[in-house]
Amino acid sequence: MRIEFLPLELGGDTLDRIKAASIEALPTDQDLVIQSDYVLSVVPPRDSLATARRIFDALQLPDTLSKRAQFCASGSPKVYFFDLNATAPRLMREIDDLFASLSVPEQKEATVQFLDGGIIGGPPVYNETDQNWKRPSIVISGPVEGLPSTFPSLLSTLDMKIVGPNIGSASALKLSFASLTKGLTALSLLSFTTAQSEGVLPELLQHLNEYSPKTGALATNGAVAMAPKAYRWVEEMRAIGEAFDSEGHWGGLGSDVFDSFAEVYRRVAEETVLGEEKIGQRQRGKEVEDVAEILARANRERT
């Protein structure tokens, strides 16, 4: 199984991680759809629609399908596009409509099949003890009839789970999960910052450890780990709020809550030194006390 990527507009740290994993770089979007049966979109949520449009445009180029037929041994013209980003079900249906509108002259069959998806859990970690990988769960939904013979292998390799036939279901599951993890982290930042401002953070941490240790561990670990990812979570919080209102029928209450959480992460990413943190190169916010003090100071300076 060949793994390929497009190096356009990626940061140096991301490129270093990709190259370390021996993933092959391709020069253009067209090369990607010519040489790939499956295209997996994993980008910041704000870039999800733009990425889908890039693939759409590449598939519409007049020589894409003929070159793909020459490259692929099967000669199959169809590309399978998975959006695995933390975006609202409404946006997934919009992307599905986009690909459904794709029309290629003299091509009777659909040239692309879209599947909704989401990644639940952290990045893969290799366990030296049992020599197995701990992998995140990749949930997908949408029509799966007629998928190629290589699809079961992809499911097994990536720990994919089909959760339903409808576009949007996988995203709803992903966002419902994230609301309880990243949402809790945003709430923890509000709590820890307030306690720090009043000089009672040590007492708060002590009481969490004594009376609700599991909550305390989740809250402190989340607060420490979030800094390098806060910029990605801004749109994810908004997507959660939208999903709660549109799919959960909360009538605006979901957006009221999670738009506020989005603002928490925006402040972290854009108004504090925590926004400069990089995964694997942490300098600040490695302890919850430092996170709370940085945010408390930033809030004082805003008023």
Describe each model-derived feature in a short phrase:
Residues 4, 24, 80, 113, ...:
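Conserved beta-strand segments of alpha/beta enzyme cores
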Residues 43-44, 86, 240:
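Short glycine-/small-residue-rich Rossmann-like dinucleotide-binding loops
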Residues 170-284:
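Helical "substrate-binding/catalytic lid" subdomain
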Residues 87-182:
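Rossmann-fold dinucleotide-binding core
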Residues 1-41, 61-75:
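NAD(P)+-binding Rossmann beta1-loop-alpha1 motif at the extreme N-terminus of oxidoreductases
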Residues 1-3, 20, 57-77, 101-110, ...:
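Eukaryotic N-terminal low-complexity, Ser/Thr- and Lys/Arg-rich leader segments
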Residues 41, 81-84, 116:
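Short catalytic-loop micro-motif centered on adjacent basic/acidic residues
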Residues 43-55, 91-92:
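Beta-loop-alpha module in the N-terminal Rossmann-like domain of NAD(P)-dependent dehydrogenases
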